[in-house]
Amino acid sequence: MLACLLITFTCEACKMGESKNLHDEIKILEKINRHFSDEFTKFFSNFLKNSVELVSCSIKIGSCTSNKEIITNLRCLNLIEILPYKKKSFIIFPYNFLSNIIDILFGGQGDFKDHTKKIRDITSTESLVNKKIMKFITNAFSEIYKKYFVKEINFFNTKTFFDFKKYNFDLNKLFLINCFNFKINNTEIFFNFLIPKSILKYQNEKKFFSTYDSHKNTCIEKNIENKVSLNDIYNVEVNIISKIIGISVSYDKIYNLSIGDVLSIKKPNKITGFIQDQAIFLGNYKRFNEQSIIFIEEFIDSSSESNQDKEYSNE
């Protein structure tokens, strides 16, 4: 399967060229779109029971004001929430996209021309097909972005608009405009995925670890193995174990503990954070909206022996 990947940047985003991280950002965006295109091709082939070929996928930074074809041929606008950043993105299907897919599903060649543009002409079948495709796209992008981007990111389809005027869309806002073009039989279909340009700032704050890269961060692994130094840990995700401070159990009671026993804790809100067996910070533990929250009060210098028992100094 031959696929063409095109990366372009419009004049509206010329400032991006000044960024020293632009090359890295492009590489990450290339990998994300290439990975998604492969996954979507497999999904679409299975869904339509037809051969699906990727024609091209492109990225450009711009607004809908300078890319009016995106909204003038709109059939449905899917509003996507990017969590936890609370950013809004959009997946836009043009006219004939859903109708051609339905035509293929019912044995046609995908060359059906839908000339209706009224909201009442949106069928329940189109809504169901849109929902199924959107579920795959959001799930796929969530998983792919977690591999190349940040672990906590998720895409959620919150609402679908079949009338562009019903959503207060900012035509001048800059987006990463991702266009995916596929061929089914002899019919080409495409859709656009608009991701806010501001999402790039989160890329700059993270260190990318691709699952396709063979290298390992041996420096961090070595530092954790020998000693934990907060100066050596940055832009990485680590597993931290929290231990409660102030719990005491008598020697005799340890051997008589049973399910249901209640143990007294002097300071139930005090905890010490550990990486492996090394204490790294002191903090307060709270429960808020069914979530466990830790407020870090002080970092512990692992090179100083005087801090080894510091977590007990406030008893």
Swiss-Prot record:
The similarity comment for this entry is: Belongs to the FliM family.
GO cellular component annotations of the record:
bacterial-type flagellum basal body; plasma membrane
GO BP term, example? bacterial-type flagellum-dependent swarming motility
Localization: Cell inner membrane; Bacterial flagellum basal body
Per its record, what are the GO molecular function terms? cytoskeletal motor activity
| Taxonomic placement | Bacteria, Pseudomonadati, Pseudomonadota, Gammaproteobacteria, Enterobacterales
- What does the record give as the function of this protein? FliM is one of three proteins (FliG, FliN, FliM) that forms the rotor-mounted switch complex (C ring), located at the base of the basal body. This complex interacts with the CheY and CheZ chemotaxis proteins, in addition to contacting components of the motor that determine the direction of flagellar rotation.
Per the record, membrane topology reads: Peripheral membrane protein
Please identify the protein, giving its name as recorded. Flagellar motor switch protein FliM
Q: Which UniProt keywords apply?
A: Bacterial flagellum, Cell inner membrane, Cell membrane, Chemotaxis, Flagellar rotation, Membrane
* Pfam families in the cross-refs: FliM, FliMN_C
- Any transmembrane segments, and where? none
What is the top-level taxon of the source organism?
Bacteria
